[in-house]
């Protein structure tokens, strides 16, 4: 299944947030969206997921989700949003309860996603007993339990310390190697984007337009072995971000 934005523009009142955005998220592909604060990254994700309708253009779905998918699109946010009165297992089972899944099948699904996210030993733990990184693992396991065609991820690691972020990036890469999931991944962290993205889409300052698209051919699991190449890509993105910031400063000076 493929998600497509076709010449999408969107405004909030008189403020134009996105302008003429066309991009796609293909099967088995992680597309990272980066750009200055306020450039419309989260708005773009909401439009992709059908939570908002664009003022112009269209958000389209091409193809079919997996036959055993309970929900073709699912979100992972910065906020883990775990119910404190449910265990880890109970938080994951919550999203299956509206799908009339047989109890034995639900148990098998939960056991599988717990194993894939390295949470099997914590099935009966309460959210208050978990670190931030463990809570985000639960959120990812919950998203995977419905076997989505595409995960929409809005800064899922930004609330975590740098060491935990590194560990979870390793886990996501390992998980992608097992499952080959598709994702649109919003981040302000360029190192994160270069580590996780098959494609990186940089938006300009508001109104967000596609300034640059960078394809990275190095396999995800091997990028740690190519520090010079990934550093070059990151520097290229950083220079583009810096140019955007300088242009914004000049515009403010002209107004003043």
Q: Whereabouts are the PLM-identified features?
A:
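The feature captures the beta-strand-to-loop junction immediately N-terminal to the Walker
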Residues: 34-36
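Helix-to-loop junction immediately C-terminal to a conserved catalytic motif
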Residues: 49
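Conserved ABC transporter NBD signature motif
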Residues: 57-68
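Short coil-to-helix segment of the ABC ATPase nucleotide-binding domain corresponding to the Q-loop/switch region
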Residues: 86-93
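Conserved ABC ATPase "signature" region
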Residues: 104-122, 173-174
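Conserved ABC ATPase signature
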Residues: 126-130, 134
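A short, proline-enriched helix->beta-strand linker immediately N-terminal to the Walker B motif
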Residues: 145-149
């Amino acid at each position: 299944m493929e998600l497509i934005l076709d010449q999408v523009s969107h405004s909030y009142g008189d403020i134009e947030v996105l302008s003429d955005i066309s991009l796609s998220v293909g099967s088995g592909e992680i597309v990272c969206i980066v750009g200055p604060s306020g450039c419309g990254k989260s708005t773009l994700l909401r439009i992709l997921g059908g939570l908002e309708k664009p003022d112009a253009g269209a958000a389209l779905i091409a193809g079919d989700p997996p036959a055993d998918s309970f929900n073709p699109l699912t979100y992972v946010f910065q906020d883990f949003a775990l119910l404190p009165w449910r265990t880890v297992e109970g938080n994951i089972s919550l999203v299956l309860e509206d799908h009339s899944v047989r109890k034995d099948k639900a148990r098998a699904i939960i056991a599988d996603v717990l194993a894939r996210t390295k949470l099997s030993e914590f099935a009966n733990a309460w959210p208050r007993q978990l670190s931030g990184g463990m809570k985000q693992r639960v959120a990812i396991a919950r998203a995977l339990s419905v076997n989505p065609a595409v995960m929409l991820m809005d800064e899922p690691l930004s609330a975590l310390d740098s060491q935990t972020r590194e560990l979870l990036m390793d886990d996501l890469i390992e998980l992608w190697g097992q499952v080959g999931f598709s994702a649109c991944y919003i981040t302000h962290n360029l190192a994160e984007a270069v580590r996780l993205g098959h494609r990186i889409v940089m938006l300009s300052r508001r109104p967000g337009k596609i300034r640059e698209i960078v394809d990275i051919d190095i396999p995800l699991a091997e990028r740690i072995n190519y520090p010079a190449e990934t550093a070059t890509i990151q520097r290229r993105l950083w220079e583009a971000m810096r140019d955007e910031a300088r242009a914004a400063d000049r515009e403010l000076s002209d107004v003043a």
